[in-house]
Amino acid sequence: MRFVIGGQIEKEKIAETLRRLAGDKTSSITVMGDIDAAMALKSGHADYYLGACNTGGGALAMAIAIVGINKCATISMPGKILLDEEIIAHVNAGKTAFGFTGQDIDAVIPVIIKAIFSS
C-alpha cells in the first residue's frame, strides 16, 4: 500500500504513526502538500491519503476537489470522533482519503489502518 500524507498540521506525526502501525505492509509513505497528495491519489501513484488540520475536514479540501467527495471521509472534528464502526464502514465503502484533527491522530489512525489491512 502506498500512502500520501497531506493536511496542514502534524504531517510527520501521521507518517511516524503510520510507519509504526503498518510497518512493512506499506510500500511507501510520502509527506506532500495537499494538492500534490491529492493528485498522487487521483493518478494512482498512491492508494490512500491521510491528513490532519484543526477542523478535520479542511485537511480534505483539495482531496475533495480533485478526487471527489465520494472518496473522502472526515473521521474526526473538534469534539467528535466517529465510532470505530463508522470509520470501518468508510474504508469498506471504498473511501481513500481521510481527514481528522491533529489531536485525534492516535485514536483514528489505528482504526483506519486495521480496516485497510483487513479489507
Descriptions of predicted regions:
Residues 61-78, 113-119:
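A short, gly/pro- and small-residue-rich
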Residues 2-6, 11, 78-119:
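C-terminal binding/interaction regions
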Residues 9, 32-36, 54, 103-104:
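Short beta->alpha linker loops
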Residues 34-70:
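Glycine-rich phosphate-binding loop
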Residues 15-45:
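Active-site rim loops that border cofactor/substrate pockets in soluble metabolic enzymes
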Residues 14-15, 59-62, 109-110:
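Short glycine-/acidic-enriched loop or helix-start segments at secondary-structure transitions
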Residues 8, 12, 28-31, 71-77:
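Juxtamembrane/disordered regions of integral membrane proteins
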Residues 5, 31, 45-49, 94:
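Metallocofactor- and cofactor-centric catalytic cores in central/energy metabolism, strongly enriched
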